[in-house]
Amino acid sequence: LSPGYATSGIPSADLKWESNKTLNVGIDMGFLEQRIIVSPEFYLNKSSNLLLNSRVPTSSGHKTMMRNIGKTSNIGFDLSITSVNIQKKNFTWTTNFNVSHNRNKIEALSGEQYFLEEARFGYDQKTHKIEVGKPIGQFYGYKTLGLYQVEDFDYNAKDQTYTLKEGIPYMSGTFNRSDIRPGMWKFDDRNGDKVIDDSDMTVIGNANPDFYGGLNNQFKYKGWDFSFFFTFSYGGEVLNATKLTNTKT
């Protein structure tokens, strides 16, 4: 064997710095001699010239090339409430509650309408869809219809085998019809061609929560202080990468 070298990608001489424009509007309001402070804030952020891998012709010998092709926007609202519950000479107890709501959107991909990306944990299946007009964080995959039932099969009592009935869709590119068994995952044949393949994949979830926040309590006694913090998030789906990798059927 002889060592060799090859290019890992196509360089681009036209790359630019990513840029951001942000607008923040907020106000601080104090009550009861500043023992309660309420701080609402609205923000709008627009990012352009985002660096993304763009598809290139296969004749180049590569699949993608890094380019400035993306534009995104973020719009949201933050609310913070701080209260001084106890304030003595040697002891203070302060509480802070905050909640946030954010919505992001892909504004442009410079000619492209969408990209399909892998989760990058050693699994070659596309798991994310980056699409113009949609939020970042869309999960992409197959919709399930539950599990294959005994009624979906012809049973041969002589050799005690199950054979999937004709006309019932299955992943023909991954399994033979004789490999399918009751209890295996059954996926939605979205285009009705009786075959489960990449054309049946669709957006199945979104990682973005509806809102999220936290609650912090801080206690100070002379030269000592102690605090504890809780966080919460409501809405948004989670991609179970371990289950995705280890569950093939």
Task: Locate each region found by the language model.
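C-terminal substrate/ligand-recognition segments
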Residues: 206-236
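Solvent-exposed, flexible loop/coil residues
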Residues: 2, 19, 47, 54-56, ...
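Extracellular/periplasmic, surface-exposed regions of secreted and cell-surface proteins
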Residues: 1-134
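Glycine- and acidic
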Residues: 9, 62-64, 198-201, 210
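Extracytoplasmic gating/loop element in the C-terminal half of outer-membrane beta-barrel translocons
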Residues: 179-182, 233-249
